[in-house]
């Protein structure tokens, strides 16, 4: 039983690390990053996302919020990682 718990814990850490590692942002000094307000403006004006929470995650900017679905008919909850230097989307997760 103890072995099973250890295995489950190890698997959870591995999955968590893999999911986090998939947002590959460049490792550059924060002095080269876009200013937070400029990044937020880009997210709203260029991508059309509504921001609920904005934060830094590792070497990425990350938001939780809402965006239009692919067909443009409804809003979806999203989690998006951005390159902090260029503002490009690195990874986008849509809650189903």
Where are these regions (language model features)?
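Alpha-helix termination/capping residues and helix-transition junctions
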Residues: 48, 83-86
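Sterically constrained small-residue positions within well-ordered secondary structures
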Residues: 12-14, 42-45, 54, 71-73
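Short, non-transmembrane alpha-helical segments in secretory-pathway proteins
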Residues: 24-51
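Exposed beta-strand-loop-beta-strand "reactive/processing" segments of non-cytosolic proteins
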Residues: 50-80, 95
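Classic N-terminal secretory signal peptides
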Residues: 1-22
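Short, low-complexity, Pro/Ser/Thr/Gly-rich segments in the mature regions of secreted, periplasmic
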Residues: 85-96
């Amino acid at each position: 039983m103890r072995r099973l718990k250890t295995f489950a814990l190890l698997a959870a850490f591995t999955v968590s690390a893999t999911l986090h590692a998939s947002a590959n942002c460049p490792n550059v000094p924060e002095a080269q990053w876009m200013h937070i307000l400029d990044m937020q403006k880009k997210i709203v004006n260029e991508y059309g996302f509504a921001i609920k929470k904005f934060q830094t995650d590792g070497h990425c900017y990350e938001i939780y919020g809402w965006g239009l679905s692919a067909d443009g008919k409804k809003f979806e909850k999203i989690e998006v990682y951005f390159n902090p230097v260029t503002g490009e989307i690195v990874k986008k997760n849509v809650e189903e």
